[in-house]
Curated annotation (Swiss-Prot):
Role noted for this protein: Acts as a negative regulator of fluconazole resistance, primarily through down-regulation of the ABC transporter gene CDR1 via inactivation of the PDR1 transcriptional pathway.
Residue stretches of biased makeup (Basic and acidic residues): 525-538
Protein name per Swiss-Prot or TrEMBL: Negative regulator of PDR1-mediated fluconazole resistance JJJ1
Keyword Metal-binding: yes
Region (Disordered): 448-476, 499-581, 599-623
Alphabetical UniProt keywords: Metal-binding, Nucleus, Zinc, Zinc-finger
GO cellular component: cytoplasm; nucleus
Bias-annotated ranges (Basic residues): 553-564, 612-623
Domain of life: Eukaryota
Zinc finger region(s), C2H2-type: 363-387
Acidic residues: bias regions: 453-466
Biased composition (Polar residues): 499-508
Gene: JJJ1
Amino acid sequence: MKTCYYDLLEVRSDASDLDLKKAYRRKALQYHPDKNPDNVEEATTIFAEIRAAYEVLSDPQERAWYDSHKEQILSDTPLNPNDEDDDYVVDSTVTGVTTEELMMFFNSSLYTSIDNSPAGFYQIAGKVFAKIAKDEVSWGLRLGLDGYKNYKDMEFEEHINSRGYILACDSSKANLSNLLFPIFGYSSTSYEELKLFYTKWSSFNTLKSFTWKDEYMYSRNYDRRTKREINKRNEKARAKAKEEYIKTVKRYVNFIKKLDQRMKEGAKKAAEKRLADERLRKENEMKLRKERLNNEQGAQFHLQSWQTIDQENWKELEKQYEKEFEKRNVDKDDELIGHEFTKNQFQTNNNSQHEDVDEIIIYDCFICKKSFKSEKQLENHIKTKLHKRNLDRVQKEMKKDSMALGLDELSDYNDFDSAESETEKLYSGMDLNDIDAELKKIEEQLAQSSVTDSEDFTDDNNDTEDQNSLVDKLSNTNYDIEIDDEINDDTNEEVQISGADNSETQNAEQDHDSNGDSEEEKEDELTRILRELEESKTSRSNFSDSDEEWSNKKKTKAKKKKNKANTPDKQPVTANKNDAKEVCGECRAEFESRNQLFSHIQTEGHVSPLSKVKKGKRSKKNK
């Protein structure tokens, strides 16, 4: 007697998933074989039915299908809708396995014993699949399809009846290509064959026409419209029956697959094998990688000459040290201990030498207190501004310390290159007697100029800041002749207002100012030369400073003159020729035009600074 799944779990037909889970746990604890050691066989059978019932009812689709076909599954005989009409009976050779007959095998109680016996799981399911395969081949032959004559599925079903299921399976393994559908096999069937079986049967499709499902009898006496309507309804019934049959076969395949322990064990073994193969593959790859790396390193690495040890020389050294040590020690025990000690010491020294090979060289900058890993990094650091500033600061500090301690002669400051080396050579090559004679001549010239120009000395000494042309003449042998054709605006205004008398007074004052300034600048130049000669031994920086100041003065003077040349005159010059006369700065000769003065300067070589004439400062009386 078949048992309903709901009755087996003791739940209602509308029970929820949570209720089904609780009922399954309760029944499993009650009928599990481990909980019933006195009645293991019966407990195993009941527990298998409980597990099958829970697997069907826990799946929503399987549960819906079970509810709709529950009466057909629980009945011992297939339900035939044509039982009421005894006049029409369908031949079983035409229909084959029907949907109603297949429904009877959805009961898990039929598969309680998982063995190769006739009442076991493998033979019951295997015979059902063989019957379905036979029907498909017979329908293919009936329809005259190509290739179906070569299929041996019909013979396999006959071999089961004549030889038995196990022998039929063994004999058909050699001719699996002649079968339309793979066989189900038994307990020793391989996992690969099972995968092929379930793959093929999961895509099952039938060739049956299901004409026995027609609702109306077709007759030629019907008119065309009636015939068309009858054919339409009969085709609809056939399609519905065919679809139901295909779904039933696929569901039966899934039902058997859940109960098949071979698939579970085979999947587990396949997973373990796959992991083992993956592990072995990785190990082989690692081994090959290590071998390849070792081969590459061995091919690239060569011992240097200093890394190799001459064994003969090493043995000779050991013998020499052993002899020396034996001479020092008389006691034999001490000799043995010392002998071992020397050997160990030599070995440790040898190991330490090999360990020293792997030392890392670090490059330090002691000025900036930084470390570098390569010489190139240190060279790049030396070129940076930060290092140069720190180096200048350290040099200045060292110079100050040496000067404070009186260690100028001992300092290494002379090792550094100086920009004033040529100037130092010039002064060092001069004779002191020549210098004294030159100084006496300069003093005589200053005395004569002071006597001649003392009468014209006035209170305009405050306006002598920019008159440095005479210093240029004394300090440089090459004269820089500068000619300015422009007339200052202040001079133009003075000429227009004061007239000829004021212009003469202005020229006199300019000459006086230039003479006074020249005397002071001569004295300043003499004192500067003497001071530079005295300090040339202790410091060289003064020469560079003087040259820089000298070049800066020239640059500023050139810029001022350029700006004056670019500045346009605000008012035109309206002075008379008699009021403004050009005077030579050397011989004091007067000329009526500037061109005459320039020609005189070029022929006679009388060059004097024209800054006083250009600036045209006003006298205190006019102010």
